[in-house]
């Protein structure tokens, strides 16, 4: 009886541990840099369009370097009060991401794909606060 109880407890603990483990988000999914025509940055009601290849390259590189988190993106927009909207425009398509500050950390959220931790330098680049 003790042996069965020990196996039962071990099984419950293993299932609990497996269920509690958190998986990081899938890698951020961005269009190929060569296909990007422009990037629109919307802060509040103001939208700026960027088509400079060097700026686009820097922006895409920073987004690709963001670290995946275990946080899930389950909404069309982030569940925070203030965010910056990023529209990456290619011929015939648009990819939308959001950037926001939460508890002194900067995040990029790609709806239904994942939430990624970025740095203040990227945030300053897209807001124009260098």
Model-flagged regions — what are they?
Residues 11-12:
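Repetitive helical segments and hydrophobic/amphipathic motifs
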Residues 15-19:
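C-terminal motif of bacterial Sec signal peptides marking the signal peptidase cleavage site
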Residues 4-7, 20-130:
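Function-determining sites in protein domains
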């Amino acid at each position: 009886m003790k042996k069965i109880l020990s196996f039962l407890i071990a099984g419950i603990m293993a299932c609990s541990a497996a269920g509690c483990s958190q998986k990081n988000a899938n890698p951020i999914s961005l269009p190929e840099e060569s296909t990007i025509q422009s990037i629109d940055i919307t802060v509040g009601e103001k939208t700026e369009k960027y088509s400079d290849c060097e700026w686009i390259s820097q922006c895409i590189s920073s987004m690709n370097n963001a670290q995946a988190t275990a946080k899930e993106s389950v909404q069309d927009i982030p569940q925070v009060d203030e965010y910056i909207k990023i529209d990456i425009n290619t011929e015939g398509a648009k990819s939308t991401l959001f950037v926001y500050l939460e508890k002194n950390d900067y995040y990029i959220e790609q709806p239904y794909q994942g939430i990624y931790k970025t740095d203040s330098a990227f945030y300053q680049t897209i807001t124009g606060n260098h």
